[in-house]
Amino acid sequence: MSKKPVALIILDGFGLREEEKGNAVAHAQKPNFDRYWNEFPHATLRADGENVGLPEGQMGNSEVGHLNIGAGRIVYQSLTRVNLSIREGDFFKNETFIKAMDHVKEKQSALHIYGLLSDGGIHSHIDHIYALLDMAKQQNVERVYVHGFLDGRDVGPTSAEVYLKGLQDKFDEVGLGKLATVHGRYYAMDRDKRWDRVEKSYRAMVYGEGPSYKNGLELLDDSYKNNIVDEFVIPSVITEEDGTPVATVKDDDAVIFCNFRPDRAIQLSQVFTNEDFRGFDRGEKMPKRLHFVCLTKFSETVKGFVAFKPTNLDNTLGEVLSQQNYTQLRIAETEKYPHVTFFFSGGREDEFPGEERILINSPKVATYDLKPEMSAYEVTDALVKEIEGEKHDVIILNFANPDMVGHSGMLEPTVKAIEAVDECLGRVVDALLQKGGAAIITADHGNADEVVTLDGKPMTAHTTNKVPVIVTEKGITLREDGILADLAPTVLDLLGADKPKEMTGKTLKQ
């Protein structure tokens, strides 16, 4: 029996875990979610590792989750692709990398590597930076500088020492490379148009402006003394003995930006690649004739060379709905809007025929623990109005709160975030059921299920725990061995629509 509208409701970062300590999902009062879990068919899904095209044991994330959900198949992720190419040796023959290295040899200029110094595997992996250093040595590049971004979010909040020491060990092993600047990801990897943050990173890289230190460990020591953890380290310059910067980015240099996930690499890349950039005044030292390489395709708005080009995903859920003349709505607040649009559509920027999008602005606060409800109420107000207007056959909705507040590593704000989302969930599901529709309530990965470790430390990273799935249709059962790729086929099943052969996921309905 076909249902309309069908809403796929993604509670971002809402994982399931038996241990209640540090578990905001367990601590939160969430009467609506609990009622749906008890009343309707439900199961759990794997959202990590090889189930979503990542290496075994790797935690999932929002980009990967939405790609898999929208594609209806396991999508092999950039991390897996790059790792494989290093293992098989293709990485070291990559023509895009070779051209960048040839460029600096010809111009007698420097190669700069930008990247998140972390093995979190969400935005980057430090092994990829190590591989580039090996390759630069093989290619006889003489001057290589690393501009390192500190994580503290997908890994422990004060774990940077491990990565800075590892990087120095690699420089020593290869006999090449120096650390030039160090930045908290809060600055260098902003994705919310807070150009004042990005400008601090740019000015450190190009002008050598900002706090200066003899080495990365001295910088860390100073930051920690001032209660600044890795993520928030102020963009800083590493200097030689005489106090001059180790390196700045200059005319004719080359850059390889070694993050593979686009969303937090776009803004900094635009600063260096776009002639018509208007975010801030780049000044007279803006590097000219810069040879800029992105590890993966970041965006149409970034004018750089791409080392690992995208693999095309045909017949994602959005495309199939459009082909079969179903209307669809994508709705989220700023922080997760790219996920329900670009990533959900398999890396496609444009809307499909019959697709509408609603973007609700995320609140302008320094960190979301200060406003745990974020813009959930505004998203819900807009969506309930759309449901009552009966315009859309399918709705893709993301509530950002459990993930974005969960990254704070603070229990109380994350509990509040979930309670706000639960209130909103009740309003959305009520509106759907009143119209004879159905909801699939699920998540893309875990996070809020562990925000404090068992020994009381903040846990800011995602988890590998299973995620829930509830289908608000009685009289059916759901199988227990599902993965995120099974959600799109389930949407099509509820609609009574045909599933394309490219979708290797299977409906969760038994």
From Swiss-Prot:
CDD domains: iPGM (cd16010). One of its GO terms (cellular component) is cytosol. Belongs to the BPG-independent phosphoglycerate mutase family. This is 2,3-bisphosphoglycerate-independent phosphoglycerate mutase. It catalyses: (2R)-2-phosphoglycerate = (2R)-3-phosphoglycerate. Signal peptide: none annotated. The keyword Translocase does not apply. Binds 2 manganese ions per subunit. Monomer.
